[in-house]
Amino acid sequence: MAKATSSLVVPIIFLVIFALVEQNMGCNDYIVGDVCVHCRERCLRYYPVTRKAECYRNHCLCIGPCPDDRPHKRFQMLNSSKNVKAQILS
């Protein structure tokens, strides 16, 4: 029986590690367009001021904390149009 419990220790350790790593990673997003021109302004257009703007491989990269569960404005608009279509069809 001791051997069976010791075989479960390694998978449990990996599960804990992966759970912690996912929580501590920030969210990155590329803004594709022209070469890195006005990256800070581009990031501020879509994200809060807590994001950091960098140029990476000729693209703007917005780095910062992950947003909460609320969808971004772009996705809220898409979802609201789907709701309108569903209301029209029903």
Curated annotation (Swiss-Prot):
Major localization listed first in the record, in broad terms: secreted
Keyword check for Ligase: no
Disulphides: C27-C66, C36-C55, C39-C60, C43-C62
Alphabetically ordered keywords of this record: Antimicrobial, Disulfide bond, Fungicide, Plant defense, Secreted, Signal
One Gene Ontology term from the biological process aspect of the record: killing of cells of another organism
Source taxon at top rank: Eukaryota
Keyword Disulfide bond: yes
One GO CC term, this protein: extracellular region
Localization, UniProt: Secreted
Signal peptide stretch: 1-23
Family the UniProt entry places it in: Belongs to the DEFL family.
Protein name: Defensin-like protein 178
Organism: Arabidopsis thaliana
